[in-house]
């Protein structure tokens, strides 16, 4: 199945999970909550982000494709819990007792703060540079700055210039 087709299929599953969790929250708090907008534009190692005032959830499409079942089971309720907490309690600690309570008491899930997904496919490439005491792994930007002569980087420990291995 093509990634776009897969993502459309997974979007339906995400919407079903959101509907299920919203029903649980509505029953628990005896009030209605509106369906959040969902976007698939988070990049890097983050699985998802909740935008409280916009009632919006942004998800990482690559991590969703690679870990669909666990992602829908854990990340979607995690981000929705942030929105529910904001609407019920206002501004509080992101993973504080209110959020943990929504995860445990409302969604019946363990309140995990960080995901455990393999992020090797979404991590940025690093370039190995050597000094006298260790190997440093520099970002693409720093590597290009060195290669184009825009920057020179030194080791903080031994004060020697870093050289590409």
Swiss-Prot record:
Spell out the catalytic residues. 79
Localized where? Cytoplasm
- What main location does UniProt list? cytoplasm
Keywords assigned: Cytoplasm, Metal-binding, Zinc
Gene Ontology terms: biological process:
response to stress
| Classification via HAMAP family | SprT (MF_00746)
- List the protein's name: Protein SprT
